[in-house]
């Protein structure tokens, strides 16, 4: 029986392998005239009739991403404090509740007084009742009018 295809003699051998770098050549399928002509002609998006027009604003969308809730006027707070038409700060709840929005009357107060007033404004804002709104992904819009229109067109 043999020990394998060939028996190697004992000792060290050095083998030098030189690799020739391979060259990859790319060839254009079009001449230069056609390339510049294609760049000038941009492809335009064509919307299918099934794509939703976002509230008739010519903003086409294929899915829902958010729901707009318009601001509602405050009910009791505005009646108690009164509407102010001129341009100075009365500390209405509609003003920002961030720490950077300090009114002129807060300038003379100490840090603790300003903090207490800011926390009170924040508490009032959080206590305001807001009707719960469904998540956009939980409630789908009613497309029955759109479907009815398509059925009439098909007949």
UniProtKB/Swiss-Prot annotation:
GO terms for molecular function: protein phosphatase 1 binding; protein serine/threonine phosphatase inhibitor activity. Its main location: nucleus. One of its GO terms (cellular component) is nucleus. Keywords: Nucleus. Transmembrane segments: none annotated. Residues 145-155 have a biased composition (Basic and acidic residues). Belongs to the YPI1 family. This is Type 1 phosphatases regulator YPI1.
């Amino acid at each position: 029986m043999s020990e394998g295809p060939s028996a190697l003699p004992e000792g060290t051998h050095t083998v030098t392998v030189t690799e020739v770098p391979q060259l990859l050549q790319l060839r254009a399928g079009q001449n230069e005239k056609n390339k510049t002509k294609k760049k000038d002609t941009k492809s335009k998006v064509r919307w299918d009739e099934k794509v939703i027009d976002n509230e008739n604003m010519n903003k086409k969308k294929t899915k829902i991403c958010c729901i707009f809730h318009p601001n509602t006027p405050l009910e009791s707070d505005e009646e108690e404090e009164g509407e102010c038409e001129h341009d100075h700060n009365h500390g209405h709840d509609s003003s920002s509740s961030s720490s950077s929005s300090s009114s002129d009357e807060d300038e003379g107060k100490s840090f603790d007084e300003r903090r207490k007033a800011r926390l009170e404004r924040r508490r009032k804002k959080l206590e305001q009742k807001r009707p719960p709104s469904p998540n956009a992904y939980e409630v789908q819009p009613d497309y029955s009018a759109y479907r009815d229109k398509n059925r009439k067109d098909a007949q």
